[in-house]
Regions:
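Conserved HGGG/HGGXW glycine-rich cap/lid loop of the alpha/beta-hydrolase fold
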Residues: 4-52
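Conserved acidic catalytic loop of the alpha/beta-hydrolase fold
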Residues: 57-71
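Conserved alpha/beta-hydrolase "acid-adjacent" motif
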Residues: 193-199
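Flexible "cap/lid" loop of the alpha/beta hydrolase fold
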Residues: 88-89, 94-126, 163
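Conserved alpha/beta-hydrolase catalytic His-Asp/Glu region
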Residues: 128-178
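Gly/Ala-rich beta-loop-alpha elbow adjacent to hydrolase catalytic centers
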Residues: 75-79, 83
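Short beta-strand/loop motif that positions the catalytic acidic residue
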Residues: 180, 186-188, 192
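Catalytic histidine-centered segment of alpha/beta-hydrolase-like enzymes
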Residues: 218-231
């Protein structure tokens, strides 16, 4: 069984990778504005939506079979880890890396902002004991009253959810990013309860060549809460 990828539009390739607990439908609100200029690849990440659970090598191989020689990639939250790793491993095919409410390392460490390890461990424990309630609360935290209907999403099974959390806990791409030379942008929401705004200050110091944008009134989903501003930024940086 292969990855579920929806392809829309025409023009330069633009790959969208969603966050934990969601699937490709989270991006549908942007399609009408972009499909006249770009070919959009809306990907269900492994274990989410209609894509089967698979490891990184299989995901990468399957995805690249569907993509043209060159593409820009947009990753939101956990999808930013996938987007970054893809760009880091095949920079010759990546034109732009564009991460939203994401971080190369999600867990808090000394001199690095992120999710407290204890909070993360408790979340994982709750997911095992009560997956439905746990993911509902997590989705509510991300949406924060945004105009978005989660009921259309396919609820992932607990194994897939736990696999995604393992990626969030274990992947650390900070060192590799030091050597990444392609155009890169990180967007943050000042009100984000998941990816702390302090991440931006640390990244600006460590990766001064990247572009950074802070949405002062956005939380974890600026592409929904500030759609027009997000689209303007995206298109201006892709020119």
């Amino acid at each position: 069984m292969n990855l579920n990828i929806k392809v829309r539009g025409q023009g330069k390739a633009l790959v969208f990778l969603h966050g934990w607990g969601f699937d490709h439908k989270v991006w549908l609100n942007l399609v009408d504005a972009l499909e006249q200029k770009y070919t959009l690849y809306l990907v269900d990440l492994p274990g989410f939506g209609l894509s089967p659970l698979m490891d990184w090598p299989h995901f990468k191989t399957d995805l690249l079979k569907h993509l043209p020689a060159h593409f820009a990639v947009v990753g939101w939250s956990m999808g930013g880890l996938f987007a970054s790793r893809l760009a880091l491993e095949i920079p010759e095919r990546t034109t732009h890396l564009f991460n939203v409410a994401s971080s190369p390392r999600f867990i808090k460490e000394e001199n690095w902002p992120g999710v407290e390890p204890l909070v993360f461990d408790n979340f994982l424990r709750n997911l095992v004991t009560n997956p439905q309630q746990t993911i509902s609360e997590f989705v509510g935290l991300q949406l924060q009253n945004q105009n978005y209907e989660y009921r259309d999403q396919i609820l992932p099974d607990p194994v897939s959810l736990e696999a995604g959390l393992t990626i969030l806990a274990d992947w650390d791409l900070r060192e590799q990013l030091y050597h990444f030379k392609k155009p890169t942008t990180y967007l943050f929401g000042r009100l984000d309860a998941i990816t702390p705004r302090a991440t931006m200050a640390v990244m600006q110091k460590n990766y001064p060549s990247f572009n950074y944008i802070m949405f002062s009134k956005a939380a974890h989903m600026p592409f929904l809460s500030h759609k027009e501003e997000f689209l303007t930024i995206l298109e201006s940086l892709l020119k």
